Amino acid sequence: MKRGHDYSSSDSELDENIEVEKESADENGNLSSAAGSMSPSTSSQILARKRRRGIIEKRRRDRINNSLSELRRLVPSAFEKQGSAKLEKAEILQMTVDHLKMLHTAGGKGYFDAHALAMDYRSLGFRECLAEVARYLSIIEGMDTTDPLRVRLVSHLNNYASQREAANTAHTGIGHIPWGGTFAHHPHLSHPLLLAQTAHTSANSTSSSTEAHHQNRLPGSPHAETSSLRVPPNGNIASVLPVVASSKLSPPLLSSMASLSAFPFSFGSFHLLSPNSLSPTTPTPSGKPYRPWGTEIGAF
């Protein structure tokens, strides 16, 4: 059976057409049998009802076709076959069912991990572009599989895609941070992004840095409250977070810092601090250290 467009319905449309033909035949029969008793207003109402039914059916078919198009775009297995083969309705629905079963088997992690889903589609798109590059080099440029330029380019793109997929897999394995205590005590956070606080940079020896680190961990040490957040040149904000267990910050501020550490994007492109603030903090002439977050702590 030849169809007019990609998503023309087959069985359901035939049934609906048969029902419409039956209704129209019944209406025509009633019209022929009771022609004398039917007024022109009644016949116009019947025609208007048939016209409305056709409009409603067309809108319903368009809604079904749009939903199938969205499923073909959202399901990864159907998205891979988008340019290579024409998919039937049953195939799209079957791929959708298989995809949902796979997500259910994985424990529902894919339902809520929007970043992982975006990375999945980015990897699929990169692989599609890689296949198009290889096809262009072989068909348009006439390069065979042993050509040095093609081998070098394709291997470079393959290695890049593999490295990004491995990095994304390692990055999305990080979960949320649970609180270990109430607000009356210091919460203990064991998160891989909350690294230990580095001591003040010293180029003299390793022992001096270790000694400064132990001074920061002492309860009465004045350096325990003077550690400042500094954004490194590479933009990784997680490596400069202070030790949470010995910090005097309130839990709401700590939760905001933890959410910043779990943010999947880099802050290297955002100018958060001036270059002068990247240097270690120096005491002011009054003897008190500079605390850029002092007003925020007072707000809590």
Curated annotation (Swiss-Prot):
<dbReference type="GO" id="GO:0000122">
    <property type="term" value="P:negative regulation of transcription by RNA polymerase II"/>
</dbReference>
<dbReference type="GO" id="GO:0046982">
    <property type="term" value="F:protein heterodimerization activity"/>
</dbReference>
<keyword id="KW-0678">Repressor</keyword>
<dbReference type="GO" id="GO:0043565">
    <property type="term" value="F:sequence-specific DNA binding"/>
</dbReference>
<dbReference type="InterPro" id="IPR036638">
    <property type="entry name" value="HLH_DNA-bd_sf"/>
</dbReference>
<dbReference type="GO" id="GO:0007219">
    <property type="term" value="P:Notch signaling pathway"/>
</dbReference>
<dbReference type="GO" id="GO:0033504">
    <property type="term" value="P:floor plate development"/>
</dbReference>
<feature type="region of interest" description="Disordered">
    <location>
        <begin position="199"/>
        <end position="232"/>
    </location>
</feature>
<keyword id="KW-0217">Developmental protein</keyword>
<dbReference type="Pfam" id="PF00010">
    <property type="entry name" value="HLH"/>
</dbReference>
<dbReference type="GO" id="GO:0045892">
    <property type="term" value="P:negative regulation of DNA-templated transcription"/>
</dbReference>
<feature type="region of interest" description="Disordered">
    <location>
        <begin position="278"/>
        <end position="300"/>
    </location>
</feature>
<feature type="domain" description="bHLH">
    <location>
        <begin position="48"/>
        <end position="103"/>
    </location>
</feature>
<comment type="similarity">
    <text>Belongs to the HEY family.</text>
</comment>
<dbReference type="GO" id="GO:0072082">
    <property type="term" value="P:specification of proximal tubule identity"/>
</dbReference>
<feature type="domain" description="Orange">
    <location>
        <begin position="121"/>
        <end position="157"/>
    </location>
</feature>
<keyword id="KW-0914">Notch signaling pathway</keyword>
<keyword id="KW-0238">DNA-binding</keyword>
<dbReference type="InterPro" id="IPR011598">
    <property type="entry name" value="bHLH_dom"/>
</dbReference>
<dbReference type="GO" id="GO:0048793">
    <property type="term" value="P:pronephros development"/>
</dbReference>
<keyword id="KW-0805">Transcription regulation</keyword>
<feature type="compositionally biased region" description="Low complexity">
    <location>
        <begin position="32"/>
        <end position="44"/>
    </location>
</feature>
<keyword id="KW-0539">Nucleus</keyword>
<dbReference type="Pfam" id="PF07527">
    <property type="entry name" value="Hairy_orange"/>
</dbReference>
<keyword id="KW-0804">Transcription</keyword>
<dbReference type="GO" id="GO:0042803">
    <property type="term" value="F:protein homodimerization activity"/>
</dbReference>
<feature type="compositionally biased region" description="Low complexity">
    <location>
        <begin position="199"/>
        <end position="210"/>
    </location>
</feature>
<dbReference type="GO" id="GO:0072013">
    <property type="term" value="P:glomus development"/>
</dbReference>
<comment type="subunit">
    <text>Efficient DNA binding requires dimerization with another bHLH protein. Binds DNA in the form of homodimer or more strongly as a heterodimer with hes1/hairy1 or hes4/hairy2b. Also weakly interacts with the bHLH proteins hes2, neurod1 and neurod4/ath3. Interacts (via Orange domain) with ccdc89/boip (via C-terminus).</text>
</comment>
<dbReference type="GO" id="GO:0005634">
    <property type="term" value="C:nucleus"/>
</dbReference>
<feature type="region of interest" description="Disordered">
    <location>
        <begin position="1"/>
        <end position="52"/>
    </location>
</feature>
<comment type="function">
    <text>Downstream effector of Notch signaling. Transcriptional repressor which binds preferentially to the canonical E box sequence 5'-CACGTG-3'. Acts as a suppressor of neurogenesis by antagonizing proneural gene function. Functions during floorplate development. Plays a role in pronephros formation in the inhibition of distal tubule and duct cell fates and the promotion of glomus and proximal tubule formation.</text>
</comment>
<protein>
    <recommendedName>
        <fullName>Hairy/enhancer-of-split related with YRPW motif protein 1</fullName>
    </recommendedName>
</protein>
<dbReference type="InterPro" id="IPR003650">
    <property type="entry name" value="Orange_dom"/>
</dbReference>
<feature type="short sequence motif" description="YRPW motif">
    <location>
        <begin position="290"/>
        <end position="293"/>
    </location>
</feature>
<dbReference type="InterPro" id="IPR050370">
    <property type="entry name" value="HES_HEY"/>
</dbReference>
